[in-house]
């Protein structure tokens, strides 16, 4: 099973503290059915797609649903054909908050974490949400303004 670290994490902490490792992967030639089965079995939302041990893309539950809704045959469509290959990746030392902002800007829910060209982990918006909510409940209400400045309203 795939897991996360189980200690208190703050929005300013590096994303490596919340990323999933090991990373669930599939080969580019894996069928849509195999992708869906892996997502369901591991109870995860995305898989890294690899070819010759190199990261080629990411395929998510959203990709599977989109292709099925368009009438794709699960037996004939591969992970390589479904995956997003114009990848946005993050570094393990990027902050949780910076990664959350990047996900919002890119409108994605999962990002591979890459270090020295190798897959170091994967992070989901769900992982980040937990940290951001915990941080907000400890500090009071946190409001992010467009400039990126942070305004903290203390609750008494």
Regions picked out by a protein language model, each given a short descriptive name:
Residues 1-156:
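Tandem CBS (Cystathionine beta-synthase) repeat/Bateman regulatory domains
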């Amino acid at each position: 099973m795939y897991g996360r670290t189980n200690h208190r994490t703050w929005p300013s902490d590096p994303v490596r503290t919340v990323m999933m490792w090991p990373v669930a992967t599939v080969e580019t030639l894996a069928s849509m059915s195999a992708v869906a089965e892996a997502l369901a079995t591991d109870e995860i939302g995305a898989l890294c797609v690899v070819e010759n041990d190199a990261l080629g893309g990411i395929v998510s539950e959203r990709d599977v649903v989109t292709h099925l809704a368009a009438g794709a045959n699960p037996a004939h469509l591969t992970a390589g054909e479904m995956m997003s290959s114009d990848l946005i990746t993050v570094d393990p030392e990027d902050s949780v908050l910076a990664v959350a902002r990047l996900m919002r800007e890119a409108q994605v829910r999962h990002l591979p974490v890459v270090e020295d060209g190798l897959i170091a982990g994967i992070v989901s918006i769900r992982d980040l949400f937990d940290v951001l909510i915990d941080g907000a409940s400890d500090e009071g209400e946190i409001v992010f303004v467009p400039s990126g400045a942070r305004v903290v309203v203390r609750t008494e």
